[in-house]
């Protein structure tokens, strides 16, 4: 009887230890991403954005993107440039394990390679910021291949990513966004057509292609001064 009671007392401890171990195991995949891109100091790239969204018509848009990880970016365009704010840019350093609760969901095979699916929930919530990220990570190459983003207001974005190899780094050549959202929540739509109709649920696709990468060229911090920035529209 005493042995049975002793075993029962150990069960909660073993369960909590197992959960802690699972979280640590999940976080190590984020560590691997951080390590992979730790040498990426800056880059420039030409961007083309194509929209196929219900109720929204706009021509393809081109711009040059200047990036300096972890959080500096500038868009240079000859006219207003519209870029989805969620999933529209590549920043592998945004997923710092210190900023998220990380949950391991499953192991899987993705495009013939080993992978895992992780759920990331921000520890600090910001108004209108994403509520959860579901990442599909290629663990053979330490690449984010899919990203599902959900927001408190009901927005859903799925990003599918393709990569090329540039100056020792795997960087996106194409990101395809699948959108499910309220039409009138992005005021930027009004710049390209008549006033929006009453709110309705719409879906669509945005294709972003990248070319002419220049990596670790020593971009000056002055490039990112707001006074020098070309007008940028961000939505979704």
Stretches found by the model and what they are:
Residues 25-28, 94-105, 155-158, 207-208:
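A short, amphipathic edge element
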Residues 1-4:
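Positively charged n-region of N-terminal signal peptides that target proteins for export
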Residues 18-48, 52-54, 234-236:
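N-terminal leader/targeting segments and the immediate start of mature chains
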Residues 32, 63-68, 158-167:
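Extended lipid/amphipathic-ligand handling interfaces
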Residues 114-225:
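Gly/Pro-enriched, hydrophobic low-complexity segments
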């Amino acid at each position: 009887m005493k042995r049975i009671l002793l075993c029962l007392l150990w069960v909660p401890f073993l369960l909590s230890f197992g959960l802690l171990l699972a979280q640590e195991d999940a976080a190590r995949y984020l560590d691997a991403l951080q390590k992979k891109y730790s040498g990426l100091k800056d880059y420039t790239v030409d961007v083309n954005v194509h929209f196929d969204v219900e109720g929204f018509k706009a021509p393809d848009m081109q711009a040059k993107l200047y990036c300096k990880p972890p959080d500096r970016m500038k868009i240079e365009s000859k006219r207003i440039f519209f870029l989805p704010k969620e999933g529209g840019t590549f920043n592998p350093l945004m997923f710092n394990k210190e900023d998220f609760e990380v949950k391991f969901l499953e192991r899987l095979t993705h495009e013939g390679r080993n992978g895992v699916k992780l759920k990331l929930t921000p520890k600090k919530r910001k108004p209108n910021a994403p509520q959860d990220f579901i990442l599909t990570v290629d663990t053979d190459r330490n690449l984010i291949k899919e990203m599902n983003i959900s927001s408190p207001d009901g927005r859903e974005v799925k990003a599918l990513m393709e990569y090329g190899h540039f100056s020792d780094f795997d960087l996106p050549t194409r990101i395809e966004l699948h959108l499910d959202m309220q039409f009138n929540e992005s005021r930027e739509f009004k710049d390209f057509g008549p006033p929006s109709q009453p709110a309705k649920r719409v879906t669509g696709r945005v294709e972003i292609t990248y070319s002419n990468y220049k990596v670790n060229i020593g971009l000056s911090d002055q490039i990112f001064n707001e006074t020098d920035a070309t007008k940028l529209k961000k939505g979704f």
